[in-house]
């Protein structure tokens, strides 16, 4: 990716390996999670991908036997075998799990608080 793209990025991506799936209506795809942020996810495009980019999706990230992150997402872009999704909504339990995951990986609570403030302001616009 270009330096300009990296400069525009406001949310740190966390490389993370978790069983993950994307759902849309009755359709379901198991996906390889490349990274996650407070803003969305990046996954490998499944071979049988036929999602409708005009309709919402749901992401499910299984972090363990009893930890699930669920997000309502929209497809932001698709290229080079990757799908970039933007988070549109996340429930309280899921954002708590995601916040903890990001906090552990960033190692900087102040940076996490700035990203959370950016997330809130982005959704208020």
From Swiss-Prot:
Q: What is the effect of changing residue 9 to A?
A: Abolishes c-di-GMP binding
Query: Per the record's keyword annotation, is Chaperone included, yes or no?
Result: no
- Show where the PilZ domain sits: 7-103
Which sequence ranges are marked TM in the entry? none
Which residues carry the site feature described as Important for c-di-GMP binding? 40
Q: Which UniProt keywords apply?
A: c-di-GMP, Nucleotide-binding
- Chain residues that bind 3',3'-c-di-GMP: 6-13, 77
Which GO molecular-function terms appear in the entry?
A: cyclic-di-GMP binding
Find motif (DXSXXG motif) and give its ranges: 35-40
InterPro entries, alphabetized: C-di-GMP_BP_PA4608, PilZ_domain
Q: Motif RXXXR motif: which ranges? A: 9-13
Function recorded in the entry: Binds the second messenger bis-(3'-5') cyclic dimeric guanosine monophosphate (c-di-GMP). Can bind two c-di-GMP molecules per monomer. May play a role in bacterial second-messenger regulated processes. Binding to c-di-GMP induces a conformational change of the C- and N-termini resulting in the exposure of a highly negative surface on one side of the protein to a possible effector protein.
Assembly mode: Monomer in both c-di-GMP-bound and free forms.
Q: What is known of its domains?
A: Consists of a six-stranded anti-parallel beta-barrel core structure with an unstructured N-terminus in apo-form and a C-terminal alpha helix. In the holo-form the C-terminal helix is displaced by the ligand, thereby opening one side of the beta-barrel as a binding site, and the N-terminus containing the RXXXR motif wraps around the ligand and in turn ties the C-terminal helix in a loose conformation. The structural rearrangement upon ligand binding creates a significant change in surface charge distribution.
UniProt name for this protein: Cyclic diguanosine monophosphate-binding protein PA4608
């Amino acid at each position: 990716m270009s330096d300009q793209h990296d400069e525009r990025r406001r949310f740190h991506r966390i490389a993370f390996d978790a069983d993950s799936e994307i759902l849309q209506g009755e359709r379901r795809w198991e996906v390889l999670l490349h990274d996650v942020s407070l803003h969305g996810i990046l996954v490998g495009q499944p071979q049988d991908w036929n999602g409708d980019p005009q309709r919402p999706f749901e992401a499910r990230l299984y972090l363990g036997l009893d930890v699930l992150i669920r997000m309502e997402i929209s497809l932001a872009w698709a290229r080079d075998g990757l799908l970039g999704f933007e988070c549109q909504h996340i429930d309280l339990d899921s954002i708590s799990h995601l916040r903890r995951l990001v906090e552990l990986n960033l190692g900087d609570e102040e940076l996490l608080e700035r990203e959370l403030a950016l997330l809130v302001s982005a959704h208020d616009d």
